[in-house]
Amino acid sequence: MKISALVMITLLICSMMILCQGQKILSNRCNNSSECIPHCIRIFGTRAAKCINRKCYCYP
């Protein structure tokens, strides 16, 4: 049981590190993720975008 909990915590930490390293934050204000897509395509060349806390986040 302790080993499985340790493995789950390790996977969680690794996945958070991967997402943090890959994301790029834009200063654009947004209300939904579809508003971020044109900006991410123009600046970074990627369509993977999310609007979190009224900021655009672009992912590779």
UniProtKB/Swiss-Prot annotation:
Write down any Gene Ontology CC term.
extracellular region
Q: Does the keyword Ribonucleoprotein apply?
A: no
Q: Does the record's keyword annotation contain Disulfide bond?
A: yes
Keyword annotations: Disulfide bond, Ion channel impairing toxin, Neurotoxin, Potassium channel impairing toxin, Secreted, Signal, Toxin, Voltage-gated potassium channel impairing toxin
Which cysteine pairs are joined by S-S bonds?
C30-C51, C36-C56, C40-C58
Q: Where is the signal peptide?
A: 1-22
Sites annotated Basic residue of the functional dyad: K50
- What is the purpose of this protein? Weakly inhibits Kv11.1/KCNH2/ERG1, Kv1.2/KCNA2 and Kv1.3/KCNA3 voltage-gated potassium channels.
Name the chain's protein.
Potassium channel toxin-like Tx677
Q: Where in the cell is it found?
A: Secreted
**What family name appears in the similarity comment?**
Belongs to the short scorpion toxin superfamily. Potassium channel inhibitor family.
Q: Give a brief account of the tissues where this protein occurs.
A: Expressed by the venom gland.
Native source species: Buthus israelis (Israeli scorpion)
Site keyed Aromatic residue of the functional dyad: positions: Y59
Tell me which SUPFAM superfamilies the record gives. Answer: Scorpion toxin-like
Q: Name one Pfam family in it.
A: Toxin_2
Parts forming coiled coils: none
- Gene Ontology terms for molecular function: ion channel inhibitor activity; potassium channel regulator activity; toxin activity
Task: Determine the domain of life of the protein's source.
Answer: Eukaryota
